[in-house]
Amino acid sequence: DVLLMKAEAQLRSGHDGSIAMNLVRNRAGMASLPATLSNLLDERLLEFMWEGWRRNDLIRFGLFHKAYDLRQPIEGESSAFTTLFPIPTNVLKLNLNLKQNPGYK
């Protein structure tokens, strides 16, 4: 995970993340690829398939609502509201300065 986080940070800051990403790929016996955000997202899917990180990755890459919100949105509803969980009611009651996340009541 640390190597893929490093590769992502390098890519997002305009540097080449190929070395870090390909250390992970080569360890698994896979051929090297150029590091792009798309290839990195695919690599995270392969590496963390059963660890429950896909939703977080898709949210971070701005793709979650495109991949999983396939229903018809209600008029006036933001289809991307599912990227945030609602703030629990008891937390809202404890801190009156907090406002519920968009899309939740």
Q: What is each PLM-predicted segment?
A:
Residues 1-23, 38-49:
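Extended, hydrophobic/aromatic-rich amphipathic alpha-helical segments that build helical scaffolds
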Residues 9, 30-31:
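Short, contiguous acidic/charged loop-to-helix segments that flank catalytic cores in large enzymes
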Residues 25, 32-105:
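Long, intrinsically disordered, low-complexity segments
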